[in-house]
Amino acid sequence: MPCHEYLPWLYLLWQEYFAGEYADHSSEPPSAKTLSVFKDPAEVKRTVCSISWYPDGGKKLAVAFAIMQFQDWRMDGMSSLSYIWDVTNPNTPEMELQPSSALCCLEYNPKDPHLLVGGSYNGLISYWDTRKGCNPADTSIIEKSHRDPVYAIAWLQGKTAFECASTSTDGQVLWWDIRKLGEPSEKLILEDKNSPDNRPMGGVCLEYSAAAGPTKFLVGTEQGSVVSCNRKAKNPADRIGTVCEGH
């Protein structure tokens, strides 16, 4: 078929596929505007440490508040509450979450929107079932928890919807099953092979994606490195893989 005979078909395809779309040739730079402001209701204002969207439609958000500066004078009167907001009502939280210590991280369970897990300033892990009120359904014990604030926590995508992993500046990655928080199910020390005193690297962020492999994850450290880890490496020494040094 000659090329000119394709043109009407291409035009119809373009009309159908790009219906309702138009090119913006304006010279105005991209912009955004504030829709709502969700303020800490506590008298002593705190830092927003973590935000997690409600997994079923994004109609709510859970926000963790804490003061992270050690020995900050404001900590004496600091509230430990964190909150869940309905995005259509920024004036009043829909629900309070009452941990034993202020939350540094907080995440909705992607498979069950009633469940949240959080890591506290005092190193404890707690989880909530929002159908049962503001108090944690369970909390780990001091002796088996992190020794520093829990900076990051992530739900794992496995056979159950109850597993998560946490990290802290104490140099540990701990795996948990929220149905039995008496002790972590596994532990990994973020060993720094370049450290003369074998001091572990402090974890400050944690990224897990099932697409990268169900046992693989990344940890960002306070030393500026990104550590690639494999939970199920055949050799325990290989659980820490590539270490990408900071600039």
Regions found by a protein language model. Give the residues of each.
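Conserved loop/turn at the beginning of each blade in beta-propeller domains
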Residues: 44, 99, 146-149, 197-199, ...
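A conserved hydrophobic secondary-structure block that centers on an alpha-helix together
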Residues: 28, 73-78, 85-118, 128
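Acidic and/or Ser/Thr-rich intrinsically disordered tails and linkers
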Residues: 1-84, 136-140, 162-165, 171, ...
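Asp-box/WD-like beta-propeller blade repeats and closely related beta-sheet repeat scaffolds
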Residues: 102-103, 135-158, 162-164, 191
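Solvent-exposed strand-loop boundary residues in beta-sheet-rich modules
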Residues: 88-89, 131, 179, 232
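Conserved beta-strand position repeated once per blade in WD40 beta-propeller domains
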Residues: 50, 105, 152-155, 205
